Every structure is written in structure tokens, then in C-alpha cells.
Amino acid sequence: MNSGVPATLAVRRVKFFGQHGGEVNSSAFSPDGQMLLTGSEDGCVYGWETRSGQLLWRLGGHTGPVKFCRFSPDGHLFASASCDCTVRLWDVARAKCLRVLKGHQRSVETVSFSPDSRQLASGGWDKRVMLWDVQSGQMLRLLVGHRDSIQSSDFSPTVNCLATGSWDSTVHIWDLRMVTPAVSHQALEGHSANISCLCYSASGLLASGSWDKTIHIWKPTTSSLLIQLKGHVTWVKSIAFSPDELWLASAGYSRMVKVWDCNTGKCLETLKGVLDVAHTCAFTPDGKILVSGAADQTRRQISRTSKSPRDPQT
């Protein structure tokens, strides 16, 4: 993990993103940090200008709640997963649906783009992971191995691997370089409940958040657990590494967001300004803003000010 000195937190409310017609289930920043994407129980995907908070568009099409949304790494596309058993691929510039990916038999709970933006993984209540070709919309592979619903996923930024988390309390790492990845995966065990969220760091560490109220940080290459973070009093809903890997943010159902020191495992800050349930959290690409989503149908941005000894002028 990064051995640098963590910056200090200066917490303040920056702005709200309202106008959702239902609970906010997911949020994601565009790679350049200029746009915020939110998915709602009202079945719509919303696009916001980060700086001003202006609503750019509200996109319908799904016939059920939007459970998850994510930008492609190249910033040209985003994907939305829904209870209607489909994944929709959207063009960012035109705010237009390009294709609907069908194949899941039950609600789709998670989607992830490969680092080159050419493939998309989806998983859900049918216990299956589907790997799609983004350009054609064709399903490339079907990954089977979890014993229960798949709730989370993320691609490794350093190797051609996909991590998936499930209600079976395990994290599976799929080596997509293998011809038959369905039988070529490793399982990370240690949680005692649903793996609700996964997040890779830039260097390839993997964090997993669970309904067992804990967060684990793993080194997937050796299947080793590096550190366990305890402090949430209810389920962990969302996690995010800061770009410098010094901090990890976690959002829970306990009306709070926590910020952790990844090296020591110490909780640096507990942010209690979130109304109702904290659903999601994310850092902007520059690490300056933490976003938390709440069931009160708003988005809240919280600023991060760096005052580390390495940067005394900030």
C-alpha cells in the first residue's frame, strides 16, 4: 500500500444534487471528473455537471429500478444495470441508448468495464457473470461458480482479471486470460455475509465491503488479506479508494460515511451529514471530492483539502 503521509480532511457540504424521483442506488464520476452519473429507484439515469450541480439529462428506458451505473474508462460510454434484467449501454456525448444487453434471467445488480473499455461484465440474482463485447453487444463468456446472487464486480487495472462478490460470502477472481475462466478462478474467503461492494486500487489491491459490517483489503496475487477495517454498525454499501491509495471511503446503511487510513486501518473521519441511508461514495479522479448518495433522493459532495507535510501550502 502507499506509504505516503495522508492528507487531512476538511469536511464541508458543497452542493446537493436533487430531483431524483426515488432512492439513489449508485453514482459514478466520469474519468475527467466533469460529470456525475446517478442511478435511481425511479428507473432513470441522471447526468450532472459536477462543478455547477446542473442536471444535464434524465434518461428513461429501464422498466425497473436502476441498481448500478458506471462510466467506461475512456469516458465515451456508460452502462446501467436494472431490475428489469437488462443492461443498457449509453453514449455520453449524445445521451443516447446504443444497445440493450439481454441474457440475465433476474435483476442485474452490477456492471464493470474492462480497463480498455472494450468489454463489460454484468452480474445479478441469476448467480451468473456475463462478459460482453461493448462494440457489438454480443455475449463473449458466461462465468459460473458463485453459489448465490452476484452483487458486486470490478476489473483489475493491472492484469486481465475480474473480481465478483456474492451473497455466498466469497469474492471470486476470474483470470480472463484463461480459455475456460469458469473453472480458472480463485476464491477469497473471510467475510461472513453478502459482498455488497468491490473496488480495485490503481496498483491492484482489492477492497471488499460486506453486510458483515467489515471491509477487507486484499492482495489478490497472493490471495492474502492485508487488513480488516471494522467500525460500521450496519451493512457496508459502497467503497472507494482515493487515487493515491492513502484513503478508503466507505458508505453504510447507518447514515454515515467513513474515511480510513489504508496503511494503519484507522478510521480518520466519520461523516454524519448524510440524511437517511448512505448508499454510495466515490472520489473524483483528483481525489478532492467525496460523494455520498442517500435515500432522501439527493447527492451530497464533501470536499477534501490536502494539508500533508509534503504539500504545506495547500
Curated annotation (Swiss-Prot):
Pfam families registered for this protein in UniProt: WD40
Region (Disordered): 294-314
GO biological process: hematopoietic progenitor cell differentiation
Keyword entries, A-Z: Repeat, WD repeat
Cellular component annotations (GO), alphabetically ordered: transferase complex
WD repeats by residue range: 19-58, 61-100, 103-142, 145-184, 190-228, 231-272, 274-312
InterPro entries: G-protein_beta_WD-40_rep (IPR020472), WD40/YVTN_repeat-like_dom_sf (IPR015943), WD40_repeat_CS (IPR019775), WD40_repeat_dom_sf (IPR036322), WD40_rpt (IPR001680)
SUPFAM superfamilies for the chain: WD40 repeat-like
UniProt entry tagged with the keyword Repeat: yes
PANTHER family, per the entry: WD REPEAT DOMAIN 5B, WD40 REPEAT PROTEIN
UniProt name for this protein: WD repeat-containing protein 38
UniProt source species: Homo sapiens (Human)
